[in-house]
Amino acid sequence: MPRYAFRIEYDGHPFKGWQRQTDLPSVQGAVEAALAKLEADVPTIAAAGRTDTGVHALGQVAHADMQRDWDPFRLAEALNYHLKPAPVAITACARAHDDFHARFSATWRSYTYRMICRRAPLVHARGHAWAVRGTLDVTAMAEGARHLIGKHDFTTFRATHCQALSPIKTMDEIRVEEVSLPAGTEIRFHLKAQSFLHNQVRSIVGSLEHVGSGAWAPDDMRRALEACDRAECGTVAPPDGLYMTGVGYDEDPFADGWKDT
């Protein structure tokens, strides 16, 4: 059966996460329902990462084995038609190698977290960013984030029910970006690693908010990391501001396929 790779964008707000769940809306369920409109034997779709309830994606990658050969453009068009009105879109599609696996072939994953600092409530970004009242020290947050670069035990920054066999992860990049808005300031946290623990990004961002507000010193991020104790984590940031932005592979699975431009 021919295997196809998909790049998927979605608004996580109406879904109970990526993973299919009985009687609950999920992104996987929405995509598989669209696939069911195209082939009698509904393909199972596997993703690079299982995002949680309310988490969004700009560059989720998934694959599925189809019953027949499809032109990638026509397959993407058909899926996007049947996905409506769900806030899910296929933005790239390609015929993949038979041994390609969206999750296990991935060499890195990237996430961006959006935080908007202002007194007024969010309107257009409501449900798509963390609203923080007051100002934050971006320089201090960037200094605190540097303590997390490299290979560490991230027990402090993972959920207590995380199922990963090991808390050891290598953080390749944490970058803090400040963007001026007409009303307020947006702070974006860009993180990149081969893989992440459950709630790792949200735990890190919530702790960095403590640094930005002055409740923690930048060095407190190192202290919390070295404690290897979940109780030493700061606030866990809400899911609203988290976006899965990309997945990397040794070979671009979409190099010879269709990509929206």
UniProtKB/Swiss-Prot annotation:
InterPro entries: PsdUridine_synth_cat_dom_sf (IPR020103), PsdUridine_synth_TruA (IPR001406), PsdUridine_synth_TruA_a/b_dom (IPR020097), PsdUridine_synth_TruA_C (IPR020095), TruA/RsuA/RluB/E/F_N (IPR020094). This is tRNA pseudouridine synthase A. Substrate binds at Y111. Homodimer. The active site is at D52 (nucleophile). It comes from Jannaschia sp. (strain CCS1). It catalyses: uridine(38/39/40) in tRNA = pseudouridine(38/39/40) in tRNA. Formation of pseudouridine at positions 38, 39 and 40 in the anticodon stem and loop of transfer RNAs. HAMAP family: TruA. GO terms for molecular function: RNA binding; tRNA pseudouridine(38-40) synthase activity. Its EC number is 5.4.99.12. It comes from the Bacteria. The gene is truA.
